[in-house]
Design a protein with these regions (language model features):
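Short beta-strand-centered aromatic/proline hotspots
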Residues: 3-7, 38, 50-78
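Short, solvent-exposed secondary-structure boundary/capping segments
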Residues: 14-19, 79-96
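Short alpha-helix capping/helix-loop boundary micro-motifs
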Residues: 15-30
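Short, well-ordered loop/turn sites that connect or cap secondary structure elements
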Residues: 31-35
């Protein structure tokens, strides 16, 4: 589900998403869909591709692979320019909405997203997606302004964390749990990122019960290091 669009970037891996407000989309996102620690994806479009190409491929029944940047929401800002502004107001909010329906409100919910890696998926019939490749780390391409931010369901989050490497030779692949973005998160300067890391581990414990013992060790070690750094 689309929850908003990219309106700004602070770096190559940190982006600001403005959550869709009333009348901006058919289904307005609820707070749980842009909660702290929520995994999201943003389509990365090559420069040569446009909407006409997508329509042409759809008519021919051809579906090209799509690359997504995968990120996590780690901060939320409520923007209200009217706060602290003194003086009389000629109209209240209800009157403005009634008599000036084209008025653009400046209030917004902004979420900060840190990109953790990339996924390439192949759209299939029936709206299903087949994951072709996964990468953890810094992507080569940046996102575009106004790109839609979509939530990821549990299955997509699992696919993002399950790597498959040839183990016993050609044709044999053993899947394993991978969190290659952890050093990438730790290197950033934000007081909220360590907490979002713990939140990510909590989610993975639910999604990968077979790896509960391993994830519990990782969480305890990370929480201990966080406590040591906080207390100095």
């Amino acid at each position: 589900m689309a929850i908003g669009k990219i309106v700004k970037s602070d770096s190559h891996i940190n982006y600001v998403c403005q959550i869709f407000g009333p009348h901006e989309t058919d289904i307005q996102p609820v707070p749980a869909e842009y909660a702290f620690g929520r995994f999201v994806r943003i389509a990365v479009r090559p420069q040569s591709q446009d909407g006409a190409d997508d329509l042409y491929d759809e008519v021919l029944g051809q579906r090209q692979p799509v690359s997504y940047a995968v990120g996590v929401i780690y901060n939320t800002i409520l923007q209200n320019p009217a706060f602290g502004v003194l003086g009389p107001r000629l109209s209240n909010e209800m009157q403005v909405e009634l008599f000036s329906p084209d008025y653009v409100t400046e209030r917004a919910i902004l979420t900060y997203i840190m990109v953790l890696g990339m996924m390439e998926v192949q759209p299939l019939a029936g709206g299903q997606l087949e994951v072709l490749s996964v990468m953890h780390g810094i992507p080569l391409l940046s996102l575009s302004l106004d790109s839609e931010v979509e939530t990821m369901d549990d299955e997509m989050v699992r696919q993002f964390h399950y790597f498959r490497d040839p183990a016993g030779g050609v044709g044999t692949q053993e899947p394993y749990l991978h969190m290659g973005y952890i050093p990438h998160i730790i290197a950033q300067h934000s007081s909220l990122l360590p907490m979002v890391t713990l939140r990510i581990i909590d989610q993975l414990e639910r999604l990968f019960p077979q790896h509960l013992a391993l994830l519990s060790i990782v969480k305890r070690n990370f929480a201990w290091h966080l406590k040591v750094e906080t207390t100095g």
